[in-house]
UniProtKB/Swiss-Prot annotation:
The EC number(s) this enzyme carries: 4.2.2.-
Compartments reported by the entry: Cell surface; Periplasm
Major location category of this protein: other
Species the sequence originates in: Formosa agariphila (strain DSM 15362 / KCTC 12365 / LMG 23005 / KMM 3901 / M-2Alg 35-1)
Upregulation: By ulvan and rhamnose.
Domain of life of the native organism: Bacteria
One term of GO molecular function: lyase activity
Function, in words: Ulvan lyase involved in ulvan degradation. Ulvan is the main polysaccharide component of the Ulvales (green seaweed) cell wall. It is composed of disaccharide building blocks comprising 3-sulfated rhamnose (Rha3S) linked to D-glucuronic acid (GlcA), L-iduronic acid (IduA), or D-xylose (Xyl). Ulvan lyase catalyzes the endolytic cleavage of the glycosidic bond between Rha3S and the uronic acids GlcA or IduA, producing oligosaccharides that have unsaturated 4-deoxy-L-threo-hex-4-enopyranosiduronic acid (deltaUA) at the non-reducing end.
Protein name: Endo-acting ulvan lyase
GO CC term (a single one): cell surface
UniProt keyword terms in alphabetical order: Lyase, Periplasm, Signal
Family: Belongs to the polysaccharide lyase family.
């Protein structure tokens, strides 16, 4: 908005308070940029190759089409698909969404080039395309206005592009000499400018759906009104009638409808203190929220929206903490590892911070973008048209040169990261050299949220260049989300790495984010971690997190501890301690573990191959509509007889000779079942097409006093550095393990104590160990030459004549 309009807005704010009563029409363009900003953008194009390249991208998309249109307008316009009678088509039936979005993207890109070049051939092309739609939609009402036939797709695609094009060519359309191509006459003719407004009002009306039910402020909603919000807001800002524009904006921002919920009172309150949208990993980015807040702040600066939602701008920087060593993201719920919205978030945040003078936020955004570009090997400037992404040109219009010599860094590799709404705790231990190969990173947790899976406390592990132990994830297409493979397996317990109680673990339908999904579960909570969320560790070798689930659906308690333990720059392992008990009858517990690979080898701790026989024990379900717990999809199931001995399972990846070594200590009677499961989504090197290896471990009774304990060592070698894993016991209670590793010819012994209370006590007089607390480690290197004592949470740790006290804190670390 121009300066004069802003001044008028300030005066009117003073006169009328917070009820907006602007009396002056918008000056266009207004949505992304103003006329006052044009020269700054042209200066960028003149000075920087990346900006020049993106202007060229706009030309590359539309120039040939504009030339063809000048010669014969009907060539392009005649190929525009028919517009359906209303917006009742399903997402699968709206097959023309891509075609309509493409032609309106051409119109908007041409309009942007008109803004940049003042060349009216671009404006004429854009106007003619828009008029084609106006001639059809001007006779309709909001209820039957559509372009592709689907009410959810229209605002995300064609409506947004239509409004952007209109905004950029607004002044051209209002020239008395402007004409548009009318197909019926096969020539350029004068036109009724009011019809553009009629169509824009129809588009906004069909998106808001004021004719439907009202909004219920504060309710739990999906991401749909966020994804449609930019397209709706763009249309509102194009309405000329000041009073109607402000009324519609009030509906969008304050009042809301059941279809397009109030941005202020329903959408924004769902952002918690962490400032991220509460869904699965890739759905949480939601850059449209920062985009909308930024545009509102540009147009209505008097609202001071940037002051009220700083938690969201802070939350934009959380996601880079969720990358695995290969740069892809951890995956919980319906999520895709390769989907990355961080750069969009940083660009929008930077634009806002620069305009508002938030120097710290501006500096942080520049640093984050600089690190992103370094990770890519340099800034890859490119505008790429996409059906569901109208914001690509903002890379140019909101582009900012990022200095190459930024020395500051944001540490996105802290050992502990918590995602509270998803019940997730991340643990990592990275190395300076070849981190993609030797870095460790895993997550544990679970919860109900939109796009959640029902998993209890699930786990995901990275190692040796792969996500070795994957969660269920999301299929490639929307259609595949609705087939039994996703709904009855990947989204359920057995499609993830968790513990199933009595063969019946399941979710329920009441409260579920999706009809017929049966995925509601309680939220897993973090009860301990060292270091705390995004804090520095006390040791470069050890860290841990413990998650707890009070499962009221399955009437059980579960607690899971994940620790990453480093033994050298090239070796390290995960410790997984899973406690589980039914609060009624403990028949049996099943520890389910998936690993990508070509084969699974089961041996005893002495190297004896375990014999297995076919079994049908996992061809069952509880009889609910989704066949919980989901393990009917296990194939080629073969089980051992129950054994007390320790077990070493090796999962082999033939492609480049990588391995996951899994050690389960002796002492508890268990049977082990190998199986093949559906292929892992987004797996590397062809494993997306190969069956996933599964190991299911069944233990009769409870698994709290005798928890499932497993040590996982990813490796590039067929032989592991971990030599033995034996249990630490307190009478009949298993409280931890002794892990002996051999690294570069030197023995490293780790005594790892994992209790179920911060006030737990363990004493082993034979080993001369005494510990008070929840989690502690004693490391002995060589023949007692170096002793390391680590208290992750606790008061005192003693070993032989060595003592470590946490004193006023709950953590401590010392090397003797």
């Amino acid at each position: 908005m121009g300066t004069s309009v802003r001044r008028i807005s300030v005066v009117l704010m003073m006169l009328f308070g917070t009820n907006f009563c602007w009396s002056q029409s918008m000056q266009h363009p207004v949505i992304w940029v103003t006329q006052d900003e044009k020269q700054d953008i042209l200066n960028l194009i003149e000075k920087y190759d990346w900006a020049k390249k993106m202007e060229h991208d706009l030309h590359a998309v539309v120039d040939k089409k504009v030339e063809a249109h000048q010669k014969k307008p009907s060539v392009i316009l005649s190929h525009i698909p028919e517009i359906p009678a209303d917006n009742s088509l399903t997402e699968f039936e709206a097959v023309t969404v891509g075609d309509h979005a493409a032609v309106l993207t051409d119109a908007s890109y041409a309009a942007m080039l008109y803004f940049l070049t003042d060349d009216e051939k671009y404006a004429q092309f854009s106007a003619d395309v828009l008029w084609h739609y106006v001639t059809v939609l001007s006779d309709r009402s909001p209820k039957n206005t559509t372009i592709c036939g689907n009410h959810f797709y229209d605002p995300r695609t064609s409506y947004a592009q239509f409004a952007l094009a209109y905004d950029f060519i607004y002044n051209f359309l209002n020239k008395p000499t402007t004409k548009v191509y009318k197909a019926s006459a096969n020539k350029q003719q004068t036109f009724d400018r009011d019809l553009f407004q009629k169509v824009l009002l129809n588009m906004v009306g069909s998106s808001l759906q004021e004719y439907g039910r009202p909004d219920t402020h504060g309710k739990f909603i999906s991401n749909h009104p966020i994804l449609t919000a930019p397209g709706v807001l763009y249309g509102i800002l194009c309405i000329e009638d000041d009073k109607e524009r402000e009324r519609l904006f009030d509906v969008f921002w304050e009042k809301g409808t059941a279809h397009q919920n109030s941005f202020k009172n329903t959408i924004l309150p769902m952002f918690g203190k962490q400032g991220i949208w509460p869904e699965s990993t890739s759905y949480s980015f939601m850059p449209a929220v920062t985009l909308v807040l930024n545009i509102i702040d540009r147009v209505y600066p008097e609202m001071q929206v940037t002051q009220n939602y700083k938690n969201i701008y802070k939350g934009n920087f959380l996601f880079d903490n969720l990358r695995m060593p290969d740069g892809r993201f951890v995956r919980y719920g319906d999520s895709k590892r390769n989907h990355d919205g961080t750069e969009q978030l940083y660009r929008y945040t930077l634009n806002l911070a620069q305009r508002r003078g938030y120097s710290n936020l501006e500096n942080q955004a520049k640093i984050a973008l600089s690190q992103a570009y370094q990770r890519q090997g340099g800034y890859q400037s490119k505008i790429s048209p996409a059906t569901f992404n109208s914001s690509e040109p903002l890379k140019l219009f909101w582009g900012t040169p990022i200095p190459k010599g930024i020395d500051s860094k944001i540490d996105f590799k802290k050992p502990t990261v918590l995602v509270e709404h998803a019940g997730i705790a991340l643990q990592r231990n990275y190395v300076e050299t070849d981190n993609e190969l030797y870095g460790l990173c895993g997550i544990i947790g679970g919860a109900h949220y939109v796009h959640s899976h029902v998993t209890g406390i699930t786990m995901e592990l990275y190692g040796a260049g792969y996500v070795m132990a994957p969660n269920g994830g999301l299929p490639k297409t929307v259609k595949e989300r609705r087939i039994p493979l996703h709904e009855n397996y990947f989204r359920l317990y057995a499609g993830n790495n968790t513990v199933i109680v009595n063969g019946t673990s399941h979710g329920i339908q009441p409260g579920s984010w999706k009809d017929g999904a049966y995925v509601w579960q309680n939220t897993v909570v973090n009860i301990a971690a060292e270091p705390k969320h995004l804090e520095d560790p006390i040791s470069e070798h050890f860290n841990f997190a413990t998650q707890f689930l009070k499962d009221t659906i399955n009437n059980c308690d579960q607690e899971r501890t994940l620790s990453t333990i480093r033994t050298s720059e090239k070796t390290g392992y995960y410790l997984d301690v899973f406690r589980s008990k039914s609060l009624t009858e403990n028949k049996f517990q099943d520890y389910i573990y998936h690993n990508i690979g070509d084969a699974t080898l089961l041996e005893t701790e002495n190297g004896e191959t375990l014999r297995t026989e076919p079994t049908t024990r996992y061809k069952t379900d509880i009889g609910d509509p989704v066949q919980s717990p989901g393990w009917r999809y296990f194939e080629d199931t073969k089980s051992t007889k129950p054994i007390h001995k320790g077990v070493h399972a090796t999962f082999k990846i033939d492609y480049d000779e990588r391995f996951m070594h899994m050690f389960v200590p002796q002492g508890v009677n268990r049977s082990y079942t190998t199986a093949l499961a559906p292929p892992t989504r987004e797996a590397k090197n062809g494993y997306e097409e190969k069956p996933t290896q599964v190991l299911a471990i069944r233990q009769d009774g409870e698994a709290w006093e005798k928890p499932f304990i497993a040590v996982f060592e990813p490796s590039v070698k067929a032989s592991s550095s971990v030599q033995t894993v034996t249990p630490l016991q307190d009478a009949d209670k298993v409280v931890g393990v002794t892990v002996i590793s051999k690294v570069n010819g030197k023995l490293i012994t780790d005594y790892i104590i994992s209790l179920d209370s911060k006030d737990g006590v363990y004493e082993n007089k034979i080993l001369k160990i005494k510990f008070e607390g929840r989690f502690g480690i004693i490391r002995v290197e060589g023949e007692q030459k170096t002793i390391s004592l680590y208290i992750g949470e606790g008061k005192t740790l003693k070993y032989n004549n060595y003592t470590l006290d946490s004193e006023t804190a709950t953590t401590a670390y010392k090397v003797f």
